[in-house]
Amino acid sequence: MEKLAASTVTDLACVTAINSSPPPLSPISEQSFNNKHQEEFAASFASLYNSIFSPESLSPSPPSSSSPPSRVDTTTEHRLLQAKLILEYDELNEHYELCLNRLQSLMTELDSLRHENDSLRFENSDLLKLIRISTSSSSSVSPPAPIHNRQFRHQISDSRSAKRNNQERNSLPKSISVRSQGYLKINHGFEASDLQTSQLSSNSVSSSQKVCVVQTKGEREALELEVYRQGMMKTELCNKWQETGACCYGDNCQFAHGIDELRPVIRHPRYKTEVCRMMVTGAMCPYGHRCHFRHSLTDQERMMMMMLTR
């Protein structure tokens, strides 16, 4: 510091001497004097600049008032965390808007489906009314079941339990088949007639026929039944009633709701006497319970099938 002060005083003296008015000179030496004066001024200014701004002071040094590195790192992490949270918030906001738009579209679709369901319900009710009207008109023409048929149905119903649960409904037969020689007569008369004759005599062909059924051993008298052709009303059990115990058509249904309503069907004399070839080959019969051949196998037939497969 003492050296700096001394140099400063010296420099100030030089500056004072330089700034002082020079003595009057001759015109010849005035130019050389000015050059010398400028050189001295530059040298004194350089020494003054070096004394004030030393090279050591120009070297970079960390400021004394700067914050510690740990504090700077904490601030940076905090800012990065805030930026990350802002990005996550933007993503959640976009996802929320997408979900809201999807919900609105689903609500619109639900409303359209509800209106469509209402219109279909009205159309279904109209169709049910038409079906009831048509079935009521057709049922009014069909004759009531005779007394001897009722007696036969009561004999079948008495052999079963009075409670009609699901197991009992599933065990009921789909139809009551009566093998008779009259089946051949009916088919022969129907095939021999032409189309016009069949249209005129459709009532006589499709009407019922009385046949005698030979009872089991121990019963001497044969039972006279009134049988119907396959496909007529109440000749087959209602699938809906057999599954759930109820039918949406009620009394207007063309199928039987129980063994009491089931009408006997006249069949070929050899109906269900031979085994279905589809069952022998191990395939499923497409006709199901309507097949005219037997689907149940005896022990002897099972043994023969096992021998054939070997």
Swiss-Prot record:
It comes from Arabidopsis thaliana. Pfam families: zf-CCCH. GO terms for biological process: negative regulation of secondary cell wall biogenesis; negative regulation of unidimensional cell growth; positive regulation of DNA-templated transcription. This is Zinc finger CCCH domain-containing protein 14. Keywords: Coiled coil, DNA-binding, Metal-binding, Repeat, Transcription, Transcription regulation, Zinc, Zinc-finger. A zinc finger (C3H1-type) spans 232-260, 270-298. The gene is C3H14. Residues 155-167 have a biased composition (Basic and acidic residues). GO terms for molecular function: DNA binding; mRNA binding; zinc ion binding. Functions probably as a transcriptional factor that activates genes involved in secondary cell wall biosynthesis. May play a role in both transcriptional and post-transcriptional regulation. Binds to ssDNA, dsDNA, and ribohomopolymers in vitro. Maybe involved in post-transcriptional regulation of its target genes. Targets RNA of a polygalacturonase, a well-known cell wall modifying gene. Functions redudantly with C3H15 to regulate secondary cell wall formation. C3H14 and C3H15 have overlapping roles in the regulation of secondary cell wall formation and anther development. Residues 84-129 form a coiled coil. Plants overexpressing C3H14 exhibit small and slightly curled leaves, and retarded stem elongations due to cell elongation defect and ectopic secondary cell wall formation. Plants overexpressing C3H14 are sterile due to stamen elongation defect, despite normal overall flower morphology. Overexpression of C3H14 results in secondary cell wall thickening in fibers and vessels. Signal peptide: none annotated. Highly expressed in secondary cell wall-forming tissues and the xylem cells of roots. Expressed predominantly in inflorescence stems, flowers and siliques. Highly expressed in the basal portion of stems, where cells are undergoing secondary cell wall thickening.
